[in-house]
Amino acid sequence: MFRCKDLLLLPSMAKARPLAGKEGMNNLIRWVYKPEDMNFSKWVHGNELLIVSLPVIKSPHFNLYRLLEKAISLHMSGMLLLVGEHYISTIPDNILSYANQHDFPIFSISGDIPLIDIFEEIGHAIAYDDQRERMDSGIFANIILGNPINPDHFIRRCQEQGYDILSLQQVFILKLVCPASSQTCDCDH
């Protein structure tokens, strides 16, 4: 799954700075959301990265502290603040303190960075992680359950996902113990 700490690996986020919420860097990011005003509760489901840009900043009732409280109460993942002359110019200490208290990551990035690049890269990263997770569970579930696997299909899927199937691999063995007798279970019966 894509997490807040992974944001800093994206090329579009190369100039982003983590400001607060270091203990929340493992928060999952399911999607991104860019509100137009302070009334966005019904538009989020949790685990979104909140992108604070011009529409919400210029809204008549904009209040960064209230926005942060709302994001935390809605179980959002973190917050990306666009900063600069026409965006957020200062970030008060009470904002950073509150985010730290709630392990809520806050990042800042210049408002001059095209948002389309950030949205696109995050979307691709989330989709790739989801696809890889499904692929991993499918391949390994079939192996563990002893289901027949087409070797050519298996090799192709591993190559698509960057697995080096020619290198030494690790195998695990399960030893099943019957709870009633504390003896190893006989798998033939």
Question: Where are the predicted features?
Answer:
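Alpha-helical/coil-rich non-catalytic "connector" segments in signaling and regulatory proteins
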Residues: 1-171, 178, 182-189
